[in-house]
């Protein structure tokens, strides 16, 4: 029996498939099934989720499904030009993805996808031999270039002769034109005049008035053209075979890359699904605890989060209550989330959720009925339960929905209790739903079982779909009947038919529900107040930081004015020292020292104020005692990587001070003596006209800084910007050479330029 299907596992996988970027990922997701060791998959998904949150989308351009090309390769056929382009684009995408992931901080992703094999030589060869429009390039071989050159010359000669023929034989032609059919130039000759032309008749018009003839003088020319076309076809076939053989000789590596990209696509879809639905990665634990768990198949605007915990000293939860109250969804979610976690999927829940590994997950859900086998509801359930009981052990998670239903309530309850006892003796973990009172009582008195119910609003006579732990559910039949208008005497008659014990139990359950509902409501109010308090606290902290920054800026301004004043006074005192008497000179010197000490104390106080703030990625900083302002690009432990424009330096955090706003502005404007020059520029999105002064300035900077090589990032797009850049570089005498980048440099989206230095 496929218990995963009963738990809606395939439907959730289909939801995740929507986030793949190729069919490779879809097929990989279909292979995922629960395993007792899902750690590696979960860690990979977690790292990729962190990647998406911090860096955005990974580079996946060109990573399409090349399975059809692989099948053709294995069959021994040569790939067509457009197929080779697809494979080349895929392999270039593999290189780009590998380079991106290996330079990030995610260890598992690095280890896994550093195994992608580079096909740099093949990619270069395809780029050389095949144009982007799918035509084999003249660069592919000298022979192909020569054949095409001959074809062009011969075509020019034939067309000239054909034009002359039309001009000189206009009286015998039906129209003043010629046609090219099946590799031959033909002329529409009037049928009555066909004997006046020596040549071969190829076609006759439907009316019979025109014959399409190949004059004798064109036969040899056409034969030569056909021969050149055949030579061209053979040479192209040879080139395509050569490129295909490059792949065939590395077929295992190609298959490995396809498998790795399928895996990455699958991980990407799972991480994307989590990111868009506020999901998290839950690692295996020794407990079962759901915190705001949301069933993926229920729309966001309708789903009610589930909170449920199985204490360590319990082996099962018995959930009771009215129909349509959410019991089935609750137990299904426990089984589904366990299966998803064990298969390497993220879960839609909050931090604090814990789930155990179960080698066996078995379920019988009420809505699954063997109608095709013509079995009754009870027989349908019992058939599955027999199989579950037979296979259950201490490694089993068992989900049973509406246990004991579909038959006489007394016998059904007795059978349900016996089944629960047997499963507990075997050590299985149980999540059971029922509406039978004897089962509720049994659960209340059993040390390994926990009672739970679905909350019911007596005012609206509708379920809230929230789980209440520790109290069994009531049927609420009398309340609902009374609310809907059933006469009171009938309801009282019904009550009188209940035994004293049943009435007391129902009253006790109702009282417990009311008390727990009130407590839950109070708990929700407190939680809401706590959240509002945390928001206010965050706001006040932010306001305090803003106010503090303003005060520091005011202090900096005052300090600057004081420094200016001290410099002015010092200058006047220095001038006075030269003309004053010795006693006066000594006194003046003391005054200067006092003023300088005050200035240093004020500066020290300002620096200490700066140091109190935490340094993060993106902050502008300067080294202690220095004036150069840099930008923090990475923080690891107690060390930061700081970009000072002309170089990057690792500096202990204790040696860094946050720059003032004015210093940041100065850095951006370039007024500090810190070079902001880079060996690359990004002109994507510019027109050729907008890019021209930027490119020329870049060449100036390369030459002035004595740097031989630079990188111009223009993107691939239509190629218009790249063409414009090359035209600018071609006219600049300082440029020694330029070319497109290698795959690792950015491919055709980057131009690498070398200048004289």
Swiss-Prot record:
<dbReference type="InterPro" id="IPR046893">
    <property type="entry name" value="MSSS"/>
</dbReference>
<keyword id="KW-0067">ATP-binding</keyword>
<dbReference type="InterPro" id="IPR036063">
    <property type="entry name" value="Smr_dom_sf"/>
</dbReference>
<feature type="domain" description="Smr">
    <location>
        <begin position="681"/>
        <end position="756"/>
    </location>
</feature>
<dbReference type="GO" id="GO:0072344">
    <property type="term" value="P:rescue of stalled ribosome"/>
</dbReference>
<comment type="subunit">
    <text>Homodimer. Binds to stalled ribosomes, contacting rRNA.</text>
</comment>
<dbReference type="InterPro" id="IPR036187">
    <property type="entry name" value="DNA_mismatch_repair_MutS_sf"/>
</dbReference>
<dbReference type="GO" id="GO:0004519">
    <property type="term" value="F:endonuclease activity"/>
</dbReference>
<keyword id="KW-0699">rRNA-binding</keyword>
<dbReference type="GO" id="GO:0005524">
    <property type="term" value="F:ATP binding"/>
</dbReference>
<dbReference type="GO" id="GO:0006298">
    <property type="term" value="P:mismatch repair"/>
</dbReference>
<dbReference type="GO" id="GO:0030983">
    <property type="term" value="F:mismatched DNA binding"/>
</dbReference>
<dbReference type="InterPro" id="IPR045076">
    <property type="entry name" value="MutS"/>
</dbReference>
<keyword id="KW-0238">DNA-binding</keyword>
<dbReference type="GO" id="GO:0043023">
    <property type="term" value="F:ribosomal large subunit binding"/>
</dbReference>
<keyword id="KW-0378">Hydrolase</keyword>
<keyword id="KW-0540">Nuclease</keyword>
<dbReference type="InterPro" id="IPR002625">
    <property type="entry name" value="Smr_dom"/>
</dbReference>
<keyword id="KW-0255">Endonuclease</keyword>
<protein>
    <recommendedName>
        <fullName>Endonuclease MutS2</fullName>
        <ecNumber>3.1.-.-</ecNumber>
        <ecNumber>3.6.4.-</ecNumber>
    </recommendedName>
</protein>
<comment type="similarity">
    <text>Belongs to the DNA mismatch repair MutS family. MutS2 subfamily.</text>
</comment>
<keyword id="KW-0694">RNA-binding</keyword>
<comment type="function">
    <text>Acts as a ribosome collision sensor, splitting the ribosome into its 2 subunits. Detects stalled/collided 70S ribosomes which it binds and splits by an ATP-hydrolysis driven conformational change. Acts upstream of the ribosome quality control system (RQC), a ribosome-associated complex that mediates the extraction of incompletely synthesized nascent chains from stalled ribosomes and their subsequent degradation. Probably generates substrates for RQC.</text>
</comment>
<dbReference type="InterPro" id="IPR007696">
    <property type="entry name" value="DNA_mismatch_repair_MutS_core"/>
</dbReference>
<dbReference type="InterPro" id="IPR000432">
    <property type="entry name" value="DNA_mismatch_repair_MutS_C"/>
</dbReference>
<dbReference type="Pfam" id="PF01713">
    <property type="entry name" value="Smr"/>
</dbReference>
<feature type="binding site">
    <location>
        <begin position="321"/>
        <end position="328"/>
    </location>
    <ligand>
        <name>ATP</name>
    </ligand>
</feature>
<comment type="function">
    <text>Endonuclease that is involved in the suppression of homologous recombination and thus may have a key role in the control of bacterial genetic diversity.</text>
</comment>
<keyword id="KW-0547">Nucleotide-binding</keyword>
<dbReference type="GO" id="GO:0045910">
    <property type="term" value="P:negative regulation of DNA recombination"/>
</dbReference>
<dbReference type="GO" id="GO:0140664">
    <property type="term" value="F:ATP-dependent DNA damage sensor activity"/>
</dbReference>
<dbReference type="Pfam" id="PF20297">
    <property type="entry name" value="MSSS"/>
</dbReference>
<dbReference type="InterPro" id="IPR027417">
    <property type="entry name" value="P-loop_NTPase"/>
</dbReference>
<dbReference type="GO" id="GO:0016887">
    <property type="term" value="F:ATP hydrolysis activity"/>
</dbReference>
<dbReference type="InterPro" id="IPR005747">
    <property type="entry name" value="MutS2"/>
</dbReference>
<dbReference type="GO" id="GO:0019843">
    <property type="term" value="F:rRNA binding"/>
</dbReference>
<dbReference type="Pfam" id="PF00488">
    <property type="entry name" value="MutS_V"/>
</dbReference>
